[in-house]
């Protein structure tokens, strides 16, 4: 089995996969530059085991060492092992066992990649445990955008970060988080 999660004794292949994810971050950064964005202020990224999130965080932290973007890692609420580890504040890995009922099947992992956790626990600004309705909202908004924007077809796992951003920006109960993250018209 080739997979992107790592544990003691199985780290080489997950590290290669994370390098590939880092290339995706570089390509996204290149597109931002082509569109006139000097540097991103925020990055919202989904996480299951955290490999994609760790690679993206690592890329942007290295690319913009003096002014890295604020990174928000979004997990399925039912499997939020990274969120639980960050909330504990002791740097230790947390595992979510048992059933993880969620529509975000790609994020229902419950156990962090040990390589990515070392990156994420030290560099991520905010971890979010998103309920299913947030991912569903993200899917709907991406599929039916405002006039002039191109529709995007996304599954639940991919739409979770967009739904999270939309909720933070539009819902009064997330005003404190919005202010904490510094999300405004200049973001």
Language-model regions: role of each:
Residues 7-122, 178-187:
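Glycine-rich phosphate/pyrophosphate-binding loop at beta-loop-alpha junctions
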Residues 112-184:
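Active-site-adjacent helical/loop segments in soluble small-molecule enzymes
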